[in-house]
Regions:
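Core structural elements
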Residues: 2-18, 36-39, 60-74, 83-100, ...
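Amphipathic alpha-helical/coiled-coil segments positioned at domain termini
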Residues: 12-20, 26-27, 109, 113-127, ...
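Short His/Asp/Glu-rich catalytic/ion-coordination signatures at enzyme active sites or charged loops
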Residues: 15-17, 21-22, 45-48, 404-438, ...
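Flexible, glycine/threonine-enriched loop-and-boundary segments that flank and lead into catalytic domains
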Residues: 3, 8, 102, 198-207, ...
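Extended, highly charged clamp/arch subdomains and adjacent linkers
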Residues: 1-200, 205-206, 352-360, 644-647
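Intrinsically disordered, low-complexity regulatory segments
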Residues: 101-103, 146-149, 160-165, 169-172, ...
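Gly/Pro-rich turn-and-neighbor structural signature
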Residues: 177-194, 444-498
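Conserved catalytic core of nucleotide polymerization and phosphodiester-bond processing enzymes
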Residues: 209-216, 221-230, 237-242, 247-248, ...
Length: 941
């Protein structure tokens, strides 16, 4: 195929910009077009002159190279470069990549009516409010102000009205009243980059504030992952009435109090609020006038105002007929004669709670407050929870100020016994060293004993330090409340001993840092102590880019998954067991069951098939002996496109059954990717510590390995059949082998049965050569099942797929990803991982095509194959036989039905070329392709 005409972009897309001094800055495309024109003219001239064939061929080659450079300069062996030595950007470069036409201009657009500024906290705001600077308000709401000025006849025409708004030196006072009126019913969207999940964009009612900073409610910081150390946020104004209504219904901050990833509260009572509430609810012994009896709470408040008692005085008071909680989870007993022993501070705290949550008669730490918000969401709903959170915020800030709690260097002191403890530890270390030099212990034993000596010494110093600390002092109050990340370990490092440190590989260094920050550290101690911090900084920097790329791939895979039907009618389900949940690091299977739909009835508790497992239902299960529950899952959903409501279950962000049109694939991708930067980059090595599996890959690299289905570095050999283990050693090579023989009682390798029927049966056998240095996990004569690992290591999901099938591979991927997240303290619902794994296992390959139109080895969507087989069977033909295929994220994203979506992901030029060659048709059904052509996306929110 020969091109006789090449496309020329409009001048607006390859501008020529005049510079000072008569020079011009032009687009690289102009240079490439110029080269094509110049060489094309040379070929024309040589043809007219009837030049020799050799010269013509050379000129044609140069013309071909110029055309190649114009279309795709980056993939040439020697790309054409500009004056700075950088390759010139060709037509392909303008379309592909992060700054290409698709990702920069089509899928991501800049918008008008937006602003950006630094954020600061404002304790006076309500949860649904934010503060915008006056200058920003005037600019954002300028069209609305101009309309009001014209309607009220304050300006003769639009030009005069615009001048009134833009006159910032001496603004007309009437503007402020009109601005308040305009802003009263308008919501603005606040966005903090990076926008890792849906809670990074929320709607607020804007109020006008002085200064240049945006003011933010302190409780929404955790949802935005924001703090007030210089963070910036963007403001966007929805213009139409429909956009305002949608923002109020879906994005308002008081309607987004649950995390979509886990269902936990997205608002967080923290820091000063926690400190103030803990101080308010403390019960300090020995206070003045303790034991007084009051008729009701108001009488106790009068006594507080008169100075007869204080906040922490233990008193007896009558309360209404309410449930009494003396401690967290202590039951719902009602006090006798409605009299309780409490403090005035606790009366004030409970006065801020709804009646259904009273009476909390214990000190409120950060963990207690988090559970209180969870209970409030369950019992009272989002609107009441937002009001309660605002009241607790005000109360906490007030009493954090009233408490006068502060922290000074004089609050800590070095325990006198420290030097004696260290001297004793040094003597023990010398004994261990002498024993080692005498050859009586090994290096590993020496290492272990040194660690034990210094661990005991550190604990002894900690005990002395804790005994000397005032239990009611400022420092102890800060630690007990949980207001900060500081625990007693940090106090020990301040005035006791820093202790043992770990090197960047994760191994404990057997030489401790004996100093503390109060006395000061030696140079070498500071260097050792800082090694962990250096590792943390490097991990965070490397994690950010890798985590962002992982999130992008997850989103690409999940884009095609949304709720498309009410019920797919499947009878299949996923079995959840208590043992499996414990292996993932969970205390029970409650969190995994929450929000699911039963696939099989639970006759023990009278639950029918199809029952929605709400919090009330799930909380009843621990009282029974049920250890396994079969539930509907995205993995077993039979909807040919998307997922049905019953297989997905509850939308964790709302607590209700998921709505049709919800983009559950994008929500799943955001839920998995958002905590990605919290995962470590570390690979732990054995280094003297016994470890059966050798090096263990954890954190983000392990998550990437699982989602990309890479072969593990230390892959465990697994049995492909059921049978009996026979361990042998090859005498010639010395290599240890494991033979797995099925139906051992009928095989010739064992004594045959009396009827000699062994010779009539075919014995299946597999032989595995074991790699040296790997720990054997099976014994001679042991009966094992298919999929059992023979040596220590990491299982390969593709081996599981070929040996045990699709369900086993899917369960393994879900459990392994969850194990990584749970190890870092991140809770994530299984259904999000199941949605992504469903897409990874969506395809099959044709093994026997039968009477279908498929090709051998062709990769097809499994639901498409089921439809083809059903049609062929109805016609009396032979169906196709297929086997499942497990794709990594990158491969799965490229297998999308839409070539527009695939081209905007990566390999743009290759995807577009293949689509053109095959004449592919895009039906414009998904999110990205609809955005590209300007249609509405197929989701309800």
């Amino acid at each position: 195929m020969t091109l006789s005409v090449i496309p020329v972009l409009p001048p607006e897309l390859r501008p020529l910009v005049p510079l000072d001094g008569g020079r011009f800055a032009c687009s690289d495309l102009n240079v490439l077009y110029e080269r094509v024109i110049y060489r094309n003219n040379r070929v024309k001239r040589f043809l007219a002159l009837e030049a020799p064939e050799v010269m013509l061929n050379n000129e044609k080659r140069l013309l071909q190279e110029a055309c190649d450079a114009l279309f795709d300069n980056g993939h040439r062996d020697r790309p054409l470069t500009g004056s700075g030595g950088q390759p010139l950007k060709s037509l392909t470069d303008t379309v592909s990549g992060k700054r290409g036409r698709l990702r920069k201009d089509v899928l991501g657009k800049r918008v008008d009516y937006s602003g950006r500024s630094v954020i600061v906290g404002d304790p006076g705001l309500s949860l649904h409010q934010c503060g915008l600077p006056t200058k920003m308000c005037l600019e954002l709401f300028k069209p609305f102000l101009i309309r009001k000025l014209l309607q009220r006849h304050y300006a003769a025409n639009a030009r005069a009205a615009k001048h009134m708004v833009e006159r910032t030196r001496k603004p007309d006072p009437i503007l402020w009243d009109l601005l308040e009126e305009v802003m009263s019913d308008q919501l603005v969207l606040l966005n903090r980059a990076p926008t890792l999940h849906r809670l990074s964009i929320q709607a607020f009612e804007a109020i006008r504030v002085e200064g240049n900073a945006i003011t933010l409610h302190p409780l929404v910081c955790s949802a935005f992952n924001a703090d007030f150390d210089g963070d910036q946020m963007a403001v966007h104004l929805p213009l139409s009435a429909e956009a305002q209504a949608e923002a109020r219904a879906l994005l308002l901050s008081t309607r987004n109090l649950r995390s979509p990833s886990s269902g936990d509260p997205s608002i967080s009572l923290s820091q000063d609020i926690v400190l103030g509430l803990f101080y308010l609810t403390q019960d300090r012994p020995g206070r003045k006038s303790a034991g007084r009896v009051f008729a009701d709470a108001s009488e106790a408040m009068h006594a507080l105002d008169a100075g007869v008692i204080d906040l922490h005085t233990r008193i007896v008071v009558r309360i209404p007929d309410q449930r009494l909680y003396e401690a967290l989870g202590s039951g719902k007993a009602r006090p006798k004669h409605k009299r309780i022993e409490t403090t005035v501070g606790r009366l004030m705290f409970n006065d801020a709670l709804p009646e259904r949550l009273r009476f909390k008669n214990y000190a409120m730490t950060k963990d207690h407050l988090k559970l209180l918000v969870v209970e409030c969401l369950q019992v009272c709903g989002t609107e009441v929870t937002a009001q309660v959170a605002d009241r607790l915020k005000t109360l906490g800030f007030h009493y954090a100020t009233r408490s006068g709690i502060s922290f000074a260097i004089s609050d800590i002191e070095v325990p006198p016994a420290k030097h004696e403890i260290l001297a004793s530890a040094d003597a023990e270390v010398e004994e261990v060293e002498q024993t080692y030099r005498a050859g009586m212990i090994t290096g590993e034993e020496r290492y272990r004993q040194l660690i034990e000596v210094w661990t005991r010494a550190t604990e002894a110093i900690s005990t002395k330090l804790e005994a000397a600390l005032d239990p009611w002092g400022s420092l102890a109050t800060i630690i007990k409340s949980g207001a900060t990340k500081a625990k007693f370990q940090q106090i020990r490092q301040l005035s006791g001993i820093r202790g043992l440190m770990a090197n960047p590989s994760g191994d404990i260094i057997p030489v401790p840092v004996k100093g503390n920050y109060l006395e000061g550290l030696k140079v070498w101690e500071l260097f050792i102590a800082a090694s962990g911090a250096r590792k943390g900084f490097m991990d965070r920097s490397l994690n950010t880019a890798r985590s962002g790329y992982l999130t992008r791939k997850l989103v690409e895979v999940g884009l095609e998954v949304w709720i498309t039907a009410e019920d797919c009618g499947t009878t299949q389900g996923l079995l959840m067991t208590h043992e499996e949940s414990k292996s993932m690091g969970l205390p029970s299977m409650r969190g995994r069951l929450l929000g699911r739909v039963l696939a099989e009835p639970l006759t023990e508790v009278g639950l029918e098939r199809g029952t929605l497992l709400s919090e009330e239902v799930v909380d009843c299960l621990p009282a029974t002996d049920i250890t396994a529950v079969c539930v509907r899952s995205p993995l077993t959903c039979q909807a040919p496109y998307g997922i049905c409501q019953r297989c997905y279950g509850i939308d964790l962000a709302t607590g209700n059954l998921v709505r049709r049109g919800t983009a559950v694939g994008v929500i799943a991708a955001q839920s998995i990717g958002e905590p990605g930067t919290q995962l470590t980059m570390r690979t732990f090595h054995s280094g003297g510590i016994a470890n059966a599996q050798g090096d263990i890959t954890l954190g983000l690299p392990r998550v990437e390995e699982l989602f990309e289905v890479r072969t593990p570095k230390h892959r465990a050999t697994m049995s492909e059949i059921d049978g009996v283990v026979v361990i042998e050693r090859d005498e010639a090579t010395g290599v240890q082998c494991v033979r797995v023989i099925s139906r051992e009682e009928r095989c010739g390798a064992y004594p045959p049965p009396p009827d000699n029927s062994a010779h009539d049966e075919v014995c299946e056998e597999r032989t595995y050569s074991l790699p040296s240095g790997h720990k054997l996990l099976v014994e001679h004569g042991q009966v094992i099942s298919a999929g059992t690992p023979l040596v220590a290591g990491t299982l390969d999901p593709r081996n599981l797929l070929s040996t045990l099938g699709r369900d086993a591979a899917a369960r393994y991927l879900v459990s392994e990803v969850q194990r990584v997240y749970h190890s870092t303290g991140v809770y994530l619902h299984d259904k999000h991982i199941e949605v992504i794994v469903r897409q990874m296992l969506r395809f099959v390959t044709a093994r026997d095509v039968g009477d279908t139109s498929l090709l051998p080895g062709e990769i097809v969507d499994r639901f498409t194959v089921e439809a083809i087989n059903a049609r062929v069977l109805a016609e009396g033909g032979a169906p196709a036989l297929v086997q499942p295929v497990l794709f990594g994220l990158t491969q799965a994203a490229m297998q999308t039905r839409s070539w527009i979506a695939a081209a905007s992901f990566q390999d743009t030029s290759r995807v577009l070329a293949w689509a053109a060659i095959r004449g592919e048709l895009d039906t414009i059904e998904g999110f990205k392709e609809r955005l590209v052509v300007g249609r509405r996306i197929p989701t309800s929110g």
